[in-house]
């Protein structure tokens, strides 16, 4: 899986509500036939659904946790 660091940084900078809104927007676009890679969608959803912010202190921490989940 290729991790898009710019995407990770952008998503990580969003508030929890903004992250959830982004996931809903992505899901809506997918339903309409627009293509967003499954890996990028999984990264965004995992970040929006994670409530343990202590583990999200850096992009590298985020990368490691997502890779472990999708592994």
UniProtKB/Swiss-Prot annotation:
The keyword Cell inner membrane does not apply. One of its GO terms (biological process) is detoxification. It comes from Mycobacterium tuberculosis (strain ATCC 25618 / H37Rv). InterPro entries: CHP02574_addiction_mod. Keywords: Toxin-antitoxin system. Antitoxin component of a type II toxin-antitoxin (TA) system. Upon expression in E.coli neutralizes the effect of cognate toxin ParE2. One of its GO terms (molecular function) is toxin sequestering activity. The lineage of its organism: Bacteria, Bacillati, Actinomycetota, Actinomycetes, Mycobacteriales. The keyword Coiled coil does not apply. It comes from the Bacteria. The gene is parD2. This is Antitoxin ParD2. NCBIfam families: stabl_TIGR02574 (TIGR02574).
